[in-house]
Amino acid sequence: MKKTLAALIVGAFAASAANAAVVYNNEGTNVELGGRLSIIAEQSNSTIKDQKQQHGALRNQSSRFHIKATHNFGDGFYAQGYLETRLVSAQSGTESDNFGHIITKYAYVTLGNKAFGEVKLGRAKTIADGITSAEDKEYGVLNNSKYIPTNGNTVGYTFKGIDGLVLGANYLLAQERNKYGTGVGEVTSQSISNGVQVGAKYDANNIIVGIAYGRTNYREDVSQQDDAGKKQQVNGALSTLGYRFSDLGLLVSLDSGYAKTKNYKDKHEKRYFVSPGFQYELMEDTNLYGNFKYERNSVDQGKKEREHAVLFGVDHKLHKQVLTYIEGAYARTRTTTRDTTKNTSTVKTEKEKSVGVGLRVYF
């Protein structure tokens, strides 16, 4: 029977987890090690911030390592600890290959039951992370975190007791606090103070439906006089609707989002996007994918931004643990700024193009 596109994509992204090495398995305790090394060769150019040069690079692309320990108590109850690290650029230095530092991306503990769901505590993904359906390896044109945070310091609940259905809720806590000065221990300016989000996604019987809503509060640091215009709260929503034509190996989807940002002593901002996309199985172990995005961000009687972006890519599994791909993206942003005192407007257009060839080796 022909493999469905979803199965291939899930297999490609979950290879490190599904094929992780079991280093210990005894009396209900299981410890796994896994990860991937990823390299991308790319060419890009941009007119953002008046940059006019073209750049080539050979760099790390989200290489990672994880360890997962699961302890089964019996009667479906379990506890789990998970730690994932990433290779990133050094905070100080000029290296551009993104291999400078190792950071902790996720670190959390889970208590759960197969029938009743699980509670997760720590630095982890939220329910908003998996809502949209668009596929990408590196140059994703969607930025869901502008609408709802997709990870953070969280207490979350997830229920997967019904086949194909995932229900989730998260409460976000502050993750960044001042270490120096008079505000030691206070949440840093413009970082998350707290937030809440809920979501649901159904993926079964060739139908994909998902929606999430979140309200996130940010520290605006109002004691500073120059904080007018800094965001205080973001109310956002994300949704997806898709259908999988199993016989054709084709998935078509439509992602969308809306957010309203409340700014301190300033006019509020509104943004939304719509993004149709597709994923197509060209042949066994080879997939074609792409999506288009239109996004608009506006302030009443103020600055307006419109972005058009498109992405296409092809990936191929050389081996169950080796994935290669070619991906390219183009984005065009048009910004209109209105000067109410002079009753004039200025328009600026920025463009960004990128294309890359990548290789991932899972272990």
UniProtKB/Swiss-Prot annotation:
Keywords: Cell outer membrane, Ion transport, Membrane, Porin, Signal, Transmembrane, Transmembrane beta strand, Transport. It is found in: Cell outer membrane. GO terms for biological process: monoatomic ion transport. InterPro entries: Gram-neg_bact_OMP, Gram_neg_porin_domain, Porin_dom_sf. GO terms for molecular function: porin activity. It comes from the Bacteria. Residues 1-20 form the signal peptide. One of its GO terms (cellular component) is cell outer membrane. Homotrimer. Forms pores that allow passive diffusion of small molecules across the outer membrane. This is Outer membrane protein P2. It comes from Haemophilus influenzae. The gene is ompP2.
